[in-house]
Amino acid sequence: MNARTPDTKSDSYDALLVLSFGGPEGPEEVRPFLENVTRGRGIPPERLDEVGAHYYHFGGVSPLNRLNKEIIANVKAELAARGYDIPVYFGNRNWKPFDNEAAEQMAADGIRNALVFATSAWGGYSGCRQYHEDIQGMRAHLEEIGAPEVTFTKLRQFYDHPRFVRTMAQYVRESFDKLPEDLRDEARLVFTAHSIPLNSKDADGNPIDGSIYSRQVEESSALIAREAGIDDFDVVWQSRSGSPHVPWLEPDIVDHAVELNENNGQKALVVCPVGFISDHMEVIWDLDSELMDEATRRGMVIERVATVGPSDEFATMVVDLIDEMEMKRVIERLGTLPVRGSTVNGEPCVPGCCAPRRRPAASQTNPNADAPVASRS
């Protein structure tokens, strides 16, 4: 199966695949899901138990699949409103419905030239290239079982799309309005996204525009703040794991809140999870549980900004991205950093971009060390 570039695509696509990370939908699914996520990484069982406790706290259910289904329903409605008559499929890397199963169904249904919307706004390995690898895996699976070939064209990164920025800015303003009136003027806006190891940060992008993920997060945050009419803000990180000896992007959101409170007497924060399009586990545990608990102990008030994924405006943006491909429209964007991500059949955006850093097996490092068990989605 030969990969192609977007310049050689056909003029019409016959399906859309929403490709995501996956999450358990019951207690019995938690451990198998985590084993899928960590397969081949040598993660100690006790680390899986620790992360599993986060899911069990919510009944063993991640909200991610439900929220993705909301996105799909909204996208279907927007497609119909614009006169598109194409089916929408759903597949995950790590849990049901699996991406290979979605690819099988697409091939059986006669789909031959599909678009792929990955539920990540960003560049970088976890935010972009890993989805290209998923596409390569789906095509290899179809070839292995003798199914008809399906061509997959991934839609581009959208961290600075006007609809994404405007909707997030609207949600930021609404969060400020929810604060007690006497705290609004002094409240600080803090953007947060999933941390990554510094060696992965340096590998994101190509040799010319490295660290693309962290730079896109910073630019997106600045665009949202400006649209919301806010001059001063912070960009921080969350959900780090792994050995404490491995440096990750900092500061951590909880550490930052504590520092603002202790050093500046900060009493109120508006926290915007810009790195996440939906309220999945990193949002509802790390922010709505851990951060809120620390804030309560300190007498701080925190308003957590809503995520954009379930909104009608987000679905409109997804179909805008489809329009760009179908009609060869000039892309809509507000930022200045490179925007890539759209290739055919899982080809990297440019040779060598966003290369994964090889993780040593747990037995080769600290046998009691944590290891990453989550990815941006």
UniProtKB/Swiss-Prot annotation:
GO cellular-component term (any): cytoplasm
Pathway(s) annotated for this protein in UniProt:
Porphyrin-containing compound metabolism; protoheme biosynthesis
Task: Locate the residues binding Fe(2+).
Answer: 194, 282
The record's listing under Pfam families reads: Ferrochelatase
Chief location category: cytoplasm
Q: Name one GO biological process term.
A: heme biosynthetic process
**Record-given protein name:** Coproporphyrin III ferrochelatase
What species does this protein belong to? Answer: Corynebacterium efficiens (strain DSM 44549 / YS-314 / AJ 12310 / JCM 11189 / NBRC 100395)
User: From which lineage does this chain's organism come?
Assistant: Bacteria, Bacillati, Actinomycetota, Actinomycetes, Mycobacteriales
List the gene name: cpfC
